[in-house]
Amino acid sequence: TSVLAEINKASFLSDTKKEKYEAEVRCARGLICYYLYDMFGPIVVATEEELDNPTQEKPLARLSKEEMVKYIETDLTYAAAHLPSPSEAEYGRFSKGLAKMLLIRLYLHETVSDKSYYDKVETLANDLMSSSMGYSLSDSYPKMFEVGGQGPDNKEIIWALPVNTEMVSWNDWHMFVLPTDFDDHGMPSGYESLNSTWYFYDSFEDGDTRRTYLVDSYKSKNGTIVNRENPGTHMELGPIPM
């Protein structure tokens, strides 16, 4: 909110630049507010005037559910109207596609209490899948999770988070999903914190490439094979989402 005020005050910015930056900020605010709303319910939203007086104590009430949804919807609708199209947006930056995807998530969230939101979901989803948006399914589902499978050429990705592969880093995901007794593929064991489900695994037919990175068996440190028939403590819940 404060950033939006500063953008409007910036006399050195053209109206076109102001519109672009406002759309990016409102998309970011819509994204963050949706996450907070999803986890905690309606939140407190301070006005620009209240933010300009941080030392003045003033109890603020949470927004109502309807006000919260409208607040997020307004930001994302503005962003969808003013952000560049996916083909014109710089890789990794916000685009119309992301704003519309977030609106779909918001509307799906609300279908629990109001089924009419499905109509909005359908309209936006059809728009997102239209040829004018430039998205398409990847020829290889597993490749999207492999080195080289991402990047601007992958038209299935709606919003990418670019990383510098030259920097020193490590794979946190494997540490969260690998079992504590994992001893396979030359990889270390992990924290055993996350699983997929057998229900999801069984939704794909045998030979479906979407099972490729759902590991349904592994060799433990004591040499036994852990799988659905011999689940131990980890595979009872489902396969490992590698």
Where are these regions (language model features)?
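Structural recognition of the beta-strand scaffold that forms the well-ordered cores
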Residues: 4, 36, 44-46, 157-161
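Short coil/linker segments at helix-helix boundaries
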Residues: 14, 42-66, 114-119
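Short coil/turn linking the two alpha-helices of tandem helical-hairpin repeats
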Residues: 37-44, 87, 106-115
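Elongated scaffold/linker segments in the mid-to-C-terminal portions of large proteins
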Residues: 123, 127-130, 134-242
